[in-house]
Amino acid sequence: MEKSMIKLKSTVIVVLFALLYLLPLNGRWLWSPDETRYAEISREMLQRGDWIVPHLLDIRYFEKPVAGYWLNNMSQWLLGHTNFSVRFASVFSTALSALLVFWLAMMLWKNQRTALLAATIYLTSLLVYGIGTYSVLDPMVTLWMTAALFSHAMILRAKLTRERLLAWGLMGLACGMGFMTKGFLALALPVISVLPVALAQKRIKELLLFGPLAIVVAVLLSAPWALAVHAREADYWHYFFWIEHIQRFAEDDAQHKAPFWYYLPFLIVGTFPWLALLPGALRSGWTERKVNPERFFLLCWMVMPLLFFSIAKGKLLTYILPCFAPLALLMAAWISGLAPVVRERLLRINSWLNIVFGGVLGLAVAALGLGIIVPHFYQPGEGLTIISGIVCFIGWIAFAAVSLRKQQTWGYLVAGCPLFLALLVGGSIPASVVDSKNPQTFIRSHQPLLEDSRYVLSDEVGLAAGLAWELKRSDITLFKARGELNYGLDYADAADRFVDEGAFPAWLADKRRSGNVALVLKTDRDSDDEYRNLPAPNQLRKSHRYVLLFYKQVVP
C-alpha cells in the first residue's frame, strides 16, 4: 500500500510538472529585455559557430560567462527557433534542481514522503516557478548551487578519506560550473554557506585540508575557456571583474540599487502556496541546530546567500533563487516532523492563507479591469483578457478550498494552486503591457515591412534583440541609446552600429540611397513627442508604446 501511494504521488508530481513547466512554455511571448537578449545571444552563437566570445547584435557582450549560453545553445539546436527552446534550459535546470532536492532529502532522512514533499514544495513555490520558466541564467546557476549544497551534505556525511576527496571534488565541479555560468558570485555563495557549518561542527581543519581540492577542480574546469576568451579578447576579464562584479554589487553607482529589506516581501510572496511553513521551518533550523544539525546546515545555505544579496547594493529579484532549494528541504523536514494534530492545524492555516492570497489578487485584477487602480491598464475590448486573469486566481482559491476538506490527506493539494495561473497567464496580460514588454507581437504584425528593410534600427537593446531574433539577422543598429552594449560599442569595429539622434537625418539620407530603412522605437509614453522631430516617414505604424517609422528607398 505504501509503495503504491508513493508511486501515485510521484506520477502526480511528474504530471503537475508537465502542466506547470512544459505545456505553457511556448504559449507566452518573450519578455524584453531578458528573454529577447538570451534568445538572440544563443542564436548568434549557433550562427557564428563561436562558443567562446559572447556577442549580442554582433557586438561584444561581456556581462556573463558562457556556460549558461551553452545550455541555451543546445536547447535551440535541438528544439529549433521557438519560444519553447528559448526557455527550455531554465526549465531543464529547475527540474534537475528538484531532483537534487529529492536525492538530498533521501540522503538526509531516508524518507520518500519527505523527499517528494521537498521536491513538490520547490517546484510549486511561486518564485521558483516564475523564474524557472523564464529565460535567464539564474535557474542554471541555481542548479550548480544546489549541486554544491548536495556536495556539502556528502562532505558532512563522509567517513573515509576517499569519500571526502570525492565530495570535495564534486563541490569544485559544481562551483566551477557555477562560475562558468554567472561568474565569481558562484564561488562566494558556497564559501559563506560552508563556513558557519564548519565553525559550528568544529570542522575548520577539514575545510582547510580538503577545501583547496575544490578550488583546484574549479580552476581546472574553467581554465580552458578562461584562457581561450583571454586569448581572443584581452579586456574580457578586466571588464567582467571590475564592472560586472565590483560596480554591480558594491560601489555607490551599483546597478539596481535597493534597500537592505528589498528581498523580504519577495521571499514571503515567493513561498506561496507554502507560506505557513516558512516561519516554523526557519525557526527550527536554529532552535534544533544541535538535535538536528542537518537543519542548521540547510539554514546556513538559505540565510547566508540571502544576507549576502541583502547587503550588496545592487539587487534583483532573481538573485535569491538559490535560497529556495534549502528552504524547501527545511519546510518539508519541519512539517513532516510535527505531530499529526499540529500538522493538520498548520495545513488548515496554510489553506486559508492561499484563499486570502488568491482572493486579493483576483480582486486586484478585477479592479485593474475596471480602471480603479490604474486607469486604462486594460483597454476596451479586453474583457476576455480580464476574465482570464480573474480565473487564474479563482483556480488558486479552488485548490486551496478543496485542500481544507481533509487536511490529513488533502492538505497538500495547495501544490495545485499555481496551475490555472501557469496555464492562463499568457492570455491575461493586457495589450498595454504586451506592447511595452513583449515585442514579438508588434514585430510579427509588421514583419513584411521589416523584412523589406535593408537597415533596421531600434532605440532599446531589448527591443533590438527581439527584432534580431524574429528577423534572424544580427545587424540591427542602435539609435540614440547605447544601453548595456555601451562597452561593446566602444570598439572600432562596432563604430557603425550606433546612430546618435542628431546625426540621424544625415545618416538616413545616405542610407536611403541603398535601401529601405525601418526605425522601431519604444516610447516612454503613448504620445508622439519622441519622434515628432524626426524626418517624416513614408509609413508610420503604432501600437501603444511601440512605433515603426518606415522610410522607403530613394533612388538617386
From Swiss-Prot:
Q: What is its main location?
A: membrane
| Protein's cellular compartments | Cell inner membrane
- Which reaction(s) does its UniProt entry say it catalyses? 4-amino-4-deoxy-alpha-L-arabinopyranosyl di-trans,octa-cis-undecaprenyl phosphate + lipid IVA = lipid IIA + di-trans,octa-cis-undecaprenyl phosphate
Q: Does the keyword Transmembrane helix apply?
A: yes
Which controlled-vocabulary keywords does the entry list? Answer: Cell inner membrane, Cell membrane, Glycosyltransferase, Lipid A biosynthesis, Lipid biosynthesis, Lipid metabolism, Lipopolysaccharide biosynthesis, Membrane, Transferase, Transmembrane, Transmembrane helix
**Membrane topology of the entry:** Multi-pass membrane protein
Q: What class of enzyme is it?
A: transferase
**EC number(s) recorded for this UniProt protein:** 2.4.2.43
User: What Pfam family is a match for this entry?
Assistant: PMT
User: Family, per the entry?
Assistant: Belongs to the glycosyltransferase 83 family.
Give the NCBIfam families listed for this entry: PRK13279.1 (NF009784)
Job description of the protein: Catalyzes the transfer of the L-Ara4N moiety of the glycolipid undecaprenyl phosphate-alpha-L-Ara4N to lipid A. The modified arabinose is attached to lipid A and is required for resistance to polymyxin and cationic antimicrobial peptides.
Name the record gives this protein: Undecaprenyl phosphate-alpha-4-amino-4-deoxy-L-arabinose arabinosyl transferase
Q: Source species, please? A: Pectobacterium atrosepticum (strain SCRI 1043 / ATCC BAA-672) (Erwinia carotovora subsp. atroseptica)
